[in-house]
């Protein structure tokens, strides 16, 4: 669908998320969330607002992400990563980017960040084929 998908599942802290966001110039749909480790999502406010990032928050961190960033970004909330990928697929326009850079642990739905990343890649490929 002329959207580029990036797997940064290893980004389990906010500094890593900010570094990933700063790697791109194109508009970003950011998949953020997972197991809430008490991260300081406020640190994302400035960059999210400046770059007009759309956020799809998922997992146990989704509600806190929403409360912290709702006035800085357009947000979608869901429980599962698969649903977050589906939403991203629907709302991201050609020429834009979907970035999985969760800023949270993976243990709520996956064994580790590697398994989460593999799941992300497989799900994106499944949408591309459909």
Where are these regions (language model features)?
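ATP-dependent carboxylate-amine ligase
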Residues: 2-4, 9-130
């Amino acid at each position: 669908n002329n959207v580029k998908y990036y797997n940064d599942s290893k980004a389990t802290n906010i500094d890593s998320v900010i570094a990933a966001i700063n790697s791109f110039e194109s508009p970003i749909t950011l998949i953020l969330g997972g197991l809430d480790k008490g991260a300081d999502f406020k640190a994302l406010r400035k960059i999210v607002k400046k770059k007009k990032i759309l956020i799809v928050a998922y997992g146990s961190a989704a509600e806190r992400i929403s409360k912290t960033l709702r006035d800085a970004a357009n947000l979608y909330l869901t429980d599962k990563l698969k649903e977050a990928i589906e939403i991203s697929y629907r709302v991201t326009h050609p020429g834009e980017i979907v970035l999985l850079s969760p800023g949270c642990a993976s243990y709520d739905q996956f064994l580790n960040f590697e398994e989460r990343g593999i799941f992300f890649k497989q799900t994106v490929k499944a949408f591309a084929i459909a």
